[in-house]
Amino acid sequence: RRVIPEPTCEAMATAMEKAQSELHKLGIGAVHNMDGATSFEALQLLRNTGRLKIRVTQSIARDNLDDAIDLGLSSGFGDEWLRIGPLKAFADGALGSQTAHLLRPYEGDSRNMGVAVASKEEIAELVGKAVLAGISCAIHAIGDRANRDVLDIFESVKAESAQRRLRHRIEHAQLLHPEDVRRFADLGVVASMQPVHILTDIPVAERHWGRRSRWAYAFRSLSKSGAMLAFGSDAPVETPDPIRGVYAAVARKQLEGTSDSGWYPEERMTVEETIRAYTAGSAMASSDELTRGTLARGLSADMTVLSRDIFSTPAAEILDVRVVGTVIAGQFVFRDGI
């Protein structure tokens, strides 16, 4: 029985207005929102009253897909502040709960291969329906079996997706079988990943996945294969702070206790590659690369000002970099001493 009432649209809008100010302090000017209908209603309220000061791509929950199709909504509909994004659905669970769907059993538990939240056939039906309606798809997949299944599904709709110019993505792509790494590039599927998880997941991955962890958070391998990488935070599961995410991708170390070379250092990214994945990569994930994501003539004047040149900052000092200014649409929405 539900005891705590759901927040009203007005209450959620008020909370969002405060939250966007906190995101501005972290240098964030755009987000991909995975929350549901009330959240979208609140965002529209902020937009219609001139209070939305962060760019939002709003996903469509599985339960709302039919309603969205009936209304004729498709990915990309909206304006520069609030746009319809992809269908969001789940293929499996998570690492910590040992419910990520694997090709082989978890270490020390020969009967557990994780959980398929929905069958491959169910997800294929959802994706097919979305594609025909002009809606791109973002499917949560953590385990190597879940990632393989979702790649198979995206392969089955490759022609229809290309015809409608839809760009699909796998959310997390956390553990991959090496044979599937190249498929992201071959299929044009975006690997939407959250480097900040590394800061807490290293011992858990080692415990549950063992030597398979070599292919966990395979940033470098995906990048070398030609895959599009889009980095984010998975907030509120992790902090939305992108500086911590940059550190995680570049150093691949916990804040304490990891070797100096990092965890599977062959998968480390450079600062430039990481920043590109957080900016241009995330814009590409939502098919917004022609309007934002890079500093170029004709694109939105959105930028983050840092306390020092992060590109020349040693990995060990990245966490010392501070955001001193955030500019959206050519206007400062946050500044600290500049």
Q: What spans do the regions from the language model cover?
A:
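Short amphipathic alpha-helices and their capping/turn segments at secondary-structure boundaries
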Residues: 66-86, 176-188
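Structured loop/turn residues at beta-strand edges in well-structured enzyme cores
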Residues: 26, 79-82, 299, 319-321
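His/Asp/Glu-enriched, well-ordered alpha-helical/loop segment
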Residues: 14, 127-138, 145-168, 172-173, ...
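Short, charged, surface-exposed secondary-structure boundary motifs
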Residues: 66-69, 201-205, 262, 336-338
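Divalent metal-binding segments
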Residues: 1-71, 85, 89-146, 159-162, ...
